[in-house]
Design a protein with these regions (language model features):
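Short, intrinsically disordered, charge-balanced linker/junction segments flanking boundaries
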Residues: 3, 236-241
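Aromatic-residue-lined binding/catalytic grooves and analogous aromatic/hydrophobic interfacial grooves
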Residues: 171, 231-232
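Extracellular/periplasmic, surface-exposed regions of secreted and cell-surface proteins
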Residues: 1-225
Length: 241
């Protein structure tokens, strides 16, 4: 409105045959607003200012990445087992080797963004600044089943939520002097990641020294705290006891 007040909004519905029927479709809205402050009367006549815009947005994006096309296929495996007291009494049976979570649905990345655009001195000085909070809910993760389930496969399930927060900025200076021109930029980002929750009270997910645990970054490196390194044989002998 009046080149000062800006708003955009979208809604989309996506479908993926990778999900079971009940979770196949997801609806993902997004909205963005902006305020071109430099168009206000109290800033419009400031000669050195070219742009000053405050903007904010919130949107939801769905993801089915990492899901195999055959996720809904149940696999049956043939195994041999001894029944009774006679070790030679071997019976062949069929077991369900792949357990499926028929409640699978879309991951949802919900992001809030607050930003500022600034240009001055005939567009030579520029600044772009963003603060964001991105929460990913219903994260698809493989879970380990107990051995009594008979399954050797770790099925996918929507069990976790994680959050990323941080800032991004880009400061630039552009100069033209006849046939000579140059651009200078200073770019910076920060990122803080942590697991917000895991459903079903599951234990931490371990992959070697990398552990995913509520309250800590995804796949954080865990290990013993080191007090020091032995420098010579004498120190080893003195601390052997």
């Amino acid at each position: 409105y009046d080149n000062k007040y800006l708003i955009t909004a979208t809604v989309r519905t996506d479908g993926s045959s990778r999900f079971p029927v009940n979770g196949r479709y997801g609806t993902f809205p997004a909205v963005g607003v902006g305020w071109a402050m430099h168009e206000e009367n109290w800033l419009k006549n400031v000669g050195w200012l070219n742009q000053l815009k405050l903007r904010s947005s919130y949107g939801v994006v769905g993801s089915d990445a990492g899901i195999p096309n055959n996720i809904q296929t149940a696999y049956v495996n043939r195994v041999n087992g001894v029944f009774g007291r006679d070790p030679a009494s071997v019976t062949t049976s069929e077991v369900l080797d792949m357990v499926i979570d028929y409640g699978l649905h879309w991951e949802e990345a919900r992001q809030f963004d607050l930003g500022l655009d600034f240009r001055a001195l005939n567009n030579r000085l520029t600044l772009e600044f963003d603060y964001y909070i991105k929460t990913t809910a219903n994260i698809l993760t493989n879970i380990t089943l107990p051995g009594i389930s008979g399954s050797t496969y770790s099925p996918l399930s929507n069990i976790a939520k994680a959050r990323n927060t941080g800032i991004e900025f880009n400061i630039g200076w552009r100069e033209n002097r006849g046939d000579f021109s140059y651009d200078l930029s200073l770019i910076g980002t920060t990122l803080k990641n942590k697991v917000v929750s895991v459903n079903q009270n599951l234990p931490p997910l371990e992959n070697g020294a990398n552990v995913t645990k509520v309250g800590y970054p995804i796949g954080g490196f865990w290990g013993y705290e080191v007090l020091g390194i032995y420098q010579n044989k004498q120190i080893i002998e003195e601390t052997a006891s």
